From Swiss-Prot:
Disordered: annotated span: 1-80
UniProt GO MF annotations: clathrin binding
One GO cellular component term noted in the UniProt record for this chain: trans-Golgi network membrane
Domain of life: Eukaryota
GO biological process: intracellular transport
Protein name, per record: Uncharacterized protein CLBA1
Lineage: Eukaryota, Metazoa, Chordata, Craniata, Vertebrata
InterPro entries documented for this protein: Aftin-like, Clathrin-bd
Pfam families, per database record: Clathrin_bdg
Amino acid sequence: MQGGQEVGRESVSDLAEEPGEGSPHQTARGQSGDGLERRRICCDGPVVLPDTNANSSRLDEGLPTSCPHPGELSGGWGEFEGFRESSAKSEQFSQSFELLGRATECQPLRTPSVPEEGSSCQVQQGGPWVTGTAAGPSSESIPSYEKVFRLAFQEVAVEQAPEDVCSLDHFLERSNEGAASVPRLCSESRKLWRALQNTDTASASRCLWGESHCRENLLPVLGVDAAQKSPPGGQGHVLEGSDLRKPEELLAVSGFHLHHCKALIQTKLSGTSSSRQGSLITYSLFLKTPLQGNGRYITIPQKKIFTPRNLKMAFFNNDVC
């Protein structure tokens, strides 16, 4: 027993005294390297090995300079060898898992509706959109989207009813007075509407407008105060010449107050047929304001634009007649 221990100590001391021949760490690296080399030859793919030199150098730095106890050396060597073997086994397991994943990727996907015979070739060549007996169900078994929508949203028969909305021309110029669908209007409104549509007869339209009782009711509808009427005695006519001034000239007039304006509606209109809303009817609205001191009036031309439907609403739906 004592002789065996002395021989073991001498062998350990010999290894410690002769570092050139080979240290226990170098031998461990050689053995672990041989084992990893065998595993790499058995495997098909390349295996990435960890840096054994760095691990061994860190282990060499951690060991003391003096020779340790043989029990401590054997225990440290066992832990180091077990660590190397576990890392090699984990690398081998990861490599086999990658090979298994590649093998499963190569296999084609199967659907329940696709038969097993020749399904892999059909799916790989044309994908899931290949039509045929092996690639998918027949076209007769697949209902079209149109049929699905017709079954889901069934058509309901609706009675087509015409709109009970008459145009303004049809509303005013209808020859058949006895029609029940068209409401009866007063003759004065018809005459006034025809005169307004005729732009050549300005004097006649002015007379009709002055004689019509619709003027009192139409002024508030058009946004004009009914109390601000033209002064009596024929002064309500539009003054030609010097009284018609441009808006920039009105700024130079002293004592101009807009709140003293007198309203006069000139029954002159112009229509445009190229508008999106149809023909637009423009009324020339003149505001007459008195100048302080001389009793003269300044006429301010303004415009109000109406579509035929809005004009019809203004005339007949606001109790103008």
